[in-house]
Amino acid sequence: MKPQYQIHPFSGEASEDQLQSIYDLNQANTPEVGSLNSMAHLKQLIDLSAYNLFVLSSKEIVGFIICMREGSSYQSENYKFFSQRLKKFLYVDRVAINEPHRRMGLGQAIYKDIFAQASNNDLPIALEVNTLPLNQPSLKFHEKMGFDRVGVKDFDDRSVAYFIK
């Protein structure tokens, strides 16, 4: 039987249990998403964010996305890449789906909501994907979803490709 999923927006008013689940899911998906050093770090990201969703299956959080708008005080080098190039944008800081729930259309469902949010506000969507270590599934997914590669950057310990749609 195929699991039932519900997608819900969330903010800093999410419950401690929900935040813990999101934190745990984030940490389980590193290095595909950046590691968070504490729950306080997650709460800080959420306070800086503009639009967030989590996915429930049988009352368990199995996916999430955290997005920022332009003008945030977020200090990520990747966020700054887009801040220096775009006047308005919706930045996908991190998205993760629990392994057993991948390839079931959840990524497309989450992005359908993000596309609607961006369209309603006339915003391009900006994000980066790791190329070192290589996150091939994410590269393929975002290219399939219509994102265009607009740049690359090498850091000391990793490299990323930048995308806009």
Language model regions located:
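Conserved GNAT acetyl-CoA-binding A-motif
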Residues: A118-T131
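Conserved acyl-donor/pantetheine-binding loop and adjacent beta-alpha core of acyl/acetyltransferases
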Residues: I66-R94
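C-terminal "cap" of GNAT-fold acetyltransferases
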Residues: V152-K165
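Conserved beta-hairpin
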Residues: A50-R69
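A short, internal acetyl-CoA/4′-phosphopantetheine-binding micro-motif in the GNAT/acyltransferase core
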Residues: D93-R103, T131-L132
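Short amphipathic alpha-helix that is part of the acyltransferase structural core
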Residues: M1-A40, E60-V62
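Conserved active-site alpha-helix within GNAT-family acetyltransferase domains
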Residues: L132-G151
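Conserved acetyl-CoA-binding loop-helix of GNAT-fold acetyltransferases
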Residues: I97, R103-A116, K144
